[in-house]
Amino acid sequence: MEPKIRLAYLVTHPIQYQAPLLRRIASEPGIDLTVFFCSDFSLRSYLDPDFGKPIAWDIPLTGGYRHEILPALGRRDRVSFWRPFSYGLARRLNRANFDVLWVHGYNRWFHWRAMAGAKIRGLKVLVRDEATNISAPRNRLKQSFKRWFFLGLRQCVDGFLAIGT
C-alpha cells in the first residue's frame, strides 16, 4: 500500500465554494489533508466590503475535513496584505511532517513566508489562485515588475493548480 501524501493547505479563511472541494480531497484514500486558516471571520456573520452587505453562510464551511485556525496578532476580521498576521504554520509543518504545502494565493505576506518556509523544509509547494494575467493595460514599469515578480514566484513553486476544468 502506498503511503498517503500529507498535504497542508494554507488559505486566508473558510470560503463557501471551497468547502465541497476540500471535503472531496479529504475523502481521497491517498491524501491526508489538513487545512490551515489564517482567520475564521467567515464562520460568523460579517460585512462584505465589496458587496456592502452582511454575509452569513447557512452551510457548514469546515465540516468533513481536518482544519486548524492559526493564531494571529491583531484583528482577524479583514483580509489584506498584512492581515491577518498569522503565525505558527512552520511549527505545524515540522510537527506533522507534511510532504506538500498548497497555498491559496501569492499576494499576501504570509503566502511568501509560508512558501519560503516550506522550501527550506524540503516540501513541495503548490499554488492555486483566482488571478488572471488578462487585465487592464499596464505601463512598462509595472509590466517589468510583474515579469520579475512571477519569475521569482516560479522559483518557489513546484506546481500551479487550475481553478475550473
Residue ranges with predicted function:
Residues 1-71, 94-96:
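N-terminal subdomain of nucleotide-sugar transferases
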Residues 8, 35, 100-102, 115-133, ...:
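Active-site proximal beta-strand in glycosyltransferases
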Residues 11-13, 75-82, 135-141:
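Short, flexible loop segments at the rims of nucleotide/cofactor-binding pockets, characterized by
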Residues 24-28, 117-121, 156:
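Alpha-helical structural signal in soluble globular domains
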Residues 40, 107, 132-133:
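Conserved beta-strand edge residues that scaffold enzyme active sites
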Residues 63-103, 108-120, 144-152:
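An amphipathic, basic-hydrophobic alpha-helix
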Residues 124-126, 132-156, 161-163:
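Nucleotide-sugar donor phosphate/pyrophosphate-binding loop at the beta->alpha transition
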